[in-house]
Amino acid sequence: MSRSVWKGPFVDGYLLKKAEEARSSEKRAVIKTWSRRSTILPQFVGLNFQVHNGNKFIPVTVTDEMVGHKLGEFAPTRTYYGHGADKKAKRK
């Protein structure tokens, strides 16, 4: 179920403040965040984030296509090793 339109997108307040500071400063500092639930806004395009996945920080550079998605979508929390192979089929 998606968020109702009248509420608008959710973004943590401190994240907006940090993004504003990064935009105004000349150097492109990386914004470290634990806020996976925050929606990516158009003013975040071009900024570099480090999103926590529960274990480490994953670097995410925001592009136009990411607007409207959540930051957590681009920092997977689970490692996929592939399906378990059948041992009988391997021996032959």
From Swiss-Prot:
Stored InterPro entries: Ribosomal_uS19 (IPR002222), Ribosomal_uS19_bac-type (IPR005732), Ribosomal_uS19_CS (IPR020934), Ribosomal_uS19_SF (IPR023575)
Superkingdom field: Bacteria
Annotated Pfam families: Ribosomal_S19 (PF00203)
A GO BP annotation: ribosomal small subunit assembly
SUPFAM superfamilies: Ribosomal protein S19
Keywords: Ribonucleoprotein, Ribosomal protein, RNA-binding, rRNA-binding
Gene Ontology cellular component terms for the protein in this record: cytoplasm; small ribosomal subunit
Listed GO MF terms: rRNA binding; structural constituent of ribosome
Functional description taken from the UniProt entry: Protein S19 forms a complex with S13 that binds strongly to the 16S ribosomal RNA.
Family: Belongs to the universal ribosomal protein uS19 family.
PANTHER family reported in the protein's UniProt record: RIBOSOMAL PROTEIN S19P FAMILY MEMBER, SMALL RIBOSOMAL SUBUNIT PROTEIN US19M
Protein name according to UniProt: Small ribosomal subunit protein uS19
Organism field: Hyphomonas neptunium (strain ATCC 15444)
Organism lineage string: Bacteria, Pseudomonadati, Pseudomonadota, Alphaproteobacteria, Hyphomonadales
Gene that specifies this protein: rpsS
